[in-house]
Amino acid sequence: MDQNSYRRRSSPIRTTTGGSKSVNFSELLQMKYLSSGTMKLTRTFTTCLIVFSVLVAFSMIFHQHPSDSNRIMGFAEARVLDAGVFPNVTNINSDKLLGGLLASGFDEDSCLSRYQSVHYRKPSPYKPSSYLISKLRNYEKLHKRCGPGTESYKKALKQLDQEHIDGDGECKYVVWISFSGLGNRILSLASVFLYALLTDRVLLVDRGKDMDDLFCEPFLGMSWLLPLDFPMTDQFDGLNQESSRCYGYMVKNQVIDTEGTLSHLYLHLVHDYGDHDKMFFCEGDQTFIGKVPWLIVKTDNYFVPSLWLIPGFDDELNKLFPQKATVFHHLGRYLFHPTNQVWGLVTRYYEAYLSHADEKIGIQVRVFDEDPGPFQHVMDQISSCTQKEKLLPEVDTLVERSRHVNTPKHKAVLVTSLNAGYAENLKSMYWEYPTSTGEIIGVHQPSQEGYQQTEKKMHNGKALAEMYLLSLTDNLVTSAWSTFGYVAQGLGGLKPWILYRPENRTTPDPSCGRAMSMEPCFHSPPFYDCKAKTGIDTGTLVPHVRHCEDISWGLKLV
């Protein structure tokens, strides 16, 4: 029987005798089983085809994304992006210890940012020296041996009640007082930590209003926070240049007893410090200061550049930082890990607004004016700088001439400012007119607090998150004089374009310039030749310490 003849029929098969060939019951039953078998065969073939397709797809996926036990698939508070989905997030298998800068062994869940931040930025071209890595590991051992609660700490604490001490103790300390705005605090704390490394001291951090809410513990096995029962804590606010244990005051009034060793000294290194306070940066004075077991420091300065001008520190600094303009880049990434709450602010915003962009541009706007703004001359300055430096495209006001690009480049612009007007101005410009290049520009601003609120925890949490977000951009524009911008450029290893400070509310010409290095500026350096005991331009003594681009009298490493 021709089976195909039954499949080819277009008219129904009838069992009656009229009009069509009659078919008996046995033939009809045979046709039914043949049809049923054909349908089963078709379904089986289709199922196999689907299964094969799925297996091929899985094979391709796992070939592109090899399994890795160190890969972080996700987390509740601040999810790490999948590098296969978001190409602007660096390789998930990147070096989470930052070339040995960070120590292993921390509880990762207690501080997500410590090891996960590497996934959100490009690998740094600046590698820490083996000497710096060794120095940090040795410091961690010292901190664990001498930190709060240890027998050595308890023994040293008893010395505070004495006027003078006999002999050298096992451990010496430098206490950093929490003082000034967040940017200043971060920079000054990094400076004091470097001083601790150079002098084999243990750094203890006054938590102030919010230091423990903002930053994780950086040292394994021992807190860096000054205990709440430290006997001098209630004196911190009152310490100034006229305090009896202020080193500058003692030098000025010639009351230093060189025969004995003082139990403690107060070092006033705030921007308003005097010439006698600045003697701290003289090698002879460091010899005396180095014997004192307890140093209490109040500063709002990034005084690292002047440490390089102290001959006794020069060799050690050169070994620690062969690339001299990497000091804050390395120490900042070592010390300052945002707490999980702050890290959540960073990652949620990054994922929502920045992760899909082909290029990320950061613009940090700080206006030192009594009026809140926004100011037209500042908006003009931002546009002039970003367009002349080819960071952002110009707009074409003749819409009919706008370029059509099949796959336009997407740039995400992150604006941080106390005022919303500057971001809104950019957003409106790139919404109302097409770009001359066909690029798509998205403008985003996480917060607009209106004015600086130094003592508010949430304000500082947002500020830290924004500094960190700026550090994750590909290119950065910062404002002159701003420590906020200094922190971002240092953490990100970025040489920013600096918006020069306007005068008389007029847009500067040129509007901005490229920084010599990513290092912060020391705003209030000493101008004193310790040997000649006379004034001198300290920005011309060595080739790697120069005057800053944004503050002519400031010093920075280059």
UniProtKB/Swiss-Prot annotation:
Residues 65-558 are lumenal. It is found in: Golgi apparatus, Golgi stack membrane; Golgi apparatus membrane. Expressed in roots, stems, leaves, flowers, siliques and seedlings. Keywords: Cell wall biogenesis/degradation, Glycoprotein, Glycosyltransferase, Golgi apparatus, Membrane, Signal-anchor, Transferase, Transmembrane, Transmembrane helix. Glycans are attached at N88, N504. One of its GO terms (molecular function) is fucosyltransferase activity. GO terms for biological process: cell wall biogenesis; cell wall organization; xyloglucan biosynthetic process. Residues 1-43 are cytoplasmic. It is an enzyme of class 2 (transferase). Its main location: Golgi. The chain crosses the membrane at residues 44-64. GO terms for cellular component: Golgi apparatus; Golgi cisterna membrane; Golgi medial cisterna; Golgi membrane. Its EC number is 2.4.1.-. Coiled coil: none annotated. It is a single-pass type II membrane protein. Gene3D superfamilies: 3.40.50.11340, 3.40.50.11350. Involved in cell wall biosynthesis. Is both necessary and sufficient for the addition of the terminal fucosyl residue on xyloglucan side chains, but is not involved in the fucosylation of other cell wall components. Associates with other xyloglucan-synthesizing enzymes to form multiprotein complexes for xyloglucan synthesis in the Golgi. Homodimer. Interacts with MUR3, XLT2, XXT2 and XXT5. Belongs to the glycosyltransferase 37 family. This is Galactoside 2-alpha-L-fucosyltransferase.
